[in-house]
A protein has these predicted regions:
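Short, well-ordered beta-strand elements
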Residues: 101-104, 180, 184-193
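Secretory targeting and sorting signals
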Residues: 1-19
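N-terminal "mature-domain start" segment
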Residues: 18-92
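Short, surface-exposed beta-strand/loop micro-motifs that present aromatic residues
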Residues: 86-93, 174-182
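Short, surface-exposed coil-to-beta transition loops
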Residues: 100-102, 170-177
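Surface-exposed amphipathic alpha-helical segments
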Residues: 190-217
């Protein structure tokens, strides 16, 4: 995981910052920080014709609220923070999905608020490191999924926080969850696949696409 993080950091660091580093990203720029359907399909290697977008994070309940958003960018976790605006999107291949991708972007008033949020999340994620938790997630089709999640090691290098986990509800899925804090923005991406571990752990690849955009808005 450390090697992948180092690669990700190298790609995310802007060669030339086109935005004024002393200025803040505005809430109106959120949509420019979201990956496109085509970008997600290219990274995941499958068609993702189903798309859901919303001006909020995701609904998720867990028996371990002290673990924050280790599974998914959740309303209960993000609403503890003073973010100004948040958008989320979920893309999947078909009902019941073999491949699922979701992303949340939150804009804060200051860089320090964004960093403070991700620092708090890092502490919460580590609370559940190498443990099993139970979650109740509002699925993309509106149903409620009960799942058991086996959380793996939590890894952090600079402003990139990552975890891989196995999720078991009606099917067994491999997932990767990555959180980036850059400027006054937090970007949260999760990828899941029921096909293989390598297919499920591609959140880094999507973060390499959208992370540098924080310096372009």
């Amino acid at each position: 995981m450390m090697g992948a993080l180092s690669v990700a950091l190298g790609v995310l660091a802007p060669a030339t910052a086109t935005a004024d580093p002393s200025s803040n990203v505005q809430p109106s720029a959120i949509d420019r920080l979201m990956f496109s359907q085509r970008e997600a399909e290219r990274v995941m290697g499958v068609g993702l014709p189903n798309v859901q977008r919303q001006s909020a994070t995701f609904a998720l309940d867990t028996d371990r609220p002290d673990c924050g958003s280790v599974v998914l960018a959740s309303v209960s976790s993000y609403d503890r923070s003073p973010y100004m605006a948040a958008h989320s999107q979920a893309l999947w291949d078909h009902p019941g999905w073999y491949t699922l991708v979701d992303q949340s972007v939150a804009v804060f008033s200051t860089d320090e608020e964004a960093r403070g949020f991700t620092r708090s999340e890092a502490d919460r994620w580590r609370t559940c490191e190498n443990q099993t938790i139970n979650v109740s997630e509002l699925a993309v089709d509106g149903s409620v999924l009960q799942a058991t999640v086996d959380v793996r090691d939590i890894t952090q290098v600079d402003n990139v926080l990552a975890v891989s986990y196995a999720r078991n509800d009606s099917a067994y899925a491999f997932c990767q969850h990555v959180l980036l804090s850059e400027r006054n923005v937090a970007i949260d991406i999760r990828t899941c696949s029921t096909v293989s571990k390598s297919d499920g752990e591609r959140a880094f690849e999507l973060m390499k696409i959208v992370g540098p955009r924080v310096w372009e808005v």
